[in-house]
């Protein structure tokens, strides 16, 4: 899985060669921003949650945004809990530090937070702790098969 599955995912749009692998780690928002040479906010981080029952939710948000539990509960109608590292790997096929909404092992519901819309391009990971791709918010929505844009974050405005 992981980087290979993400590259395979991007073949649908002939974009597999746009995935960049770095010599240094891009596993955290801070490392990714430094490695790529952009602000923290332009890193599109993917956060994995368990909803009701076996439902898995992936929320992609700007690197400077934090989940607002009240907004999240209002949006989804329940309190979601973050997945453990083992659950993340099992559900997405990606290790923490490389989680992204592409080339997933299963089909979690993918949501994009509006905190990303303020940028012309953002940089989500690509399945490994040292990879990313530059996408417009529109491309991110299309390539991730996201359900809808949501507003569940704080501290970014």
UniProtKB/Swiss-Prot annotation:
Q: Which GO terms describe its molecular function?
A: aminoacyl-tRNA deacylase activity
What InterPro entries has UniProt attached to this entry? Answer: YbaK/aa-tRNA-synt-asso_dom_sf (IPR036754), YbaK/aa-tRNA-synth-assoc-dom (IPR007214)
In terms of Pfam families, this protein maps to:
tRNA_edit
The record's disulfide annotation reads none
Q: What is the protein name given in its UniProt record? A: Uncharacterized protein YwhH
PANTHER family, per the entry: CYTOPLASMIC PROTEIN
Q: Where does this protein have coiled-coil stretches?
A: none
């Amino acid at each position: 899985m992981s980087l290979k599955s993400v590259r395979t995912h991007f073949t649908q749009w002939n974009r597999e060669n746009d995935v960049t692998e770095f010599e240094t780690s891009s596993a955290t928002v801070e490392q990714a921003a430094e490695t790529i040479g952009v602000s923290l906010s332009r890193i599109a981080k993917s956060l994995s949650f368990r909803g009701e029952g076996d439902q898995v939710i992936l929320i992609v948000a700007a690197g400077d945004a934090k989940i607002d539990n009240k907004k999240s509960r209002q949006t989804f109608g329940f309190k979601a809990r973050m997945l453990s590292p083992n659950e993340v790997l099992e559900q997405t096929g990606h290790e923490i530090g490389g989680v992204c909404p592409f080339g997933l092992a299963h089909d979690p519901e993918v949501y994009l937070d509006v905190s990303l819309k303020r940028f012309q391009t953002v940089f989500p990971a690509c399945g490994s702790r040292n990879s990313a791709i530059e996408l417009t918010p529109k491309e991110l929505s299309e390539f991730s098969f996201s359900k809808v844009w949501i507003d569940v974050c704080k501290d970014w405005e």
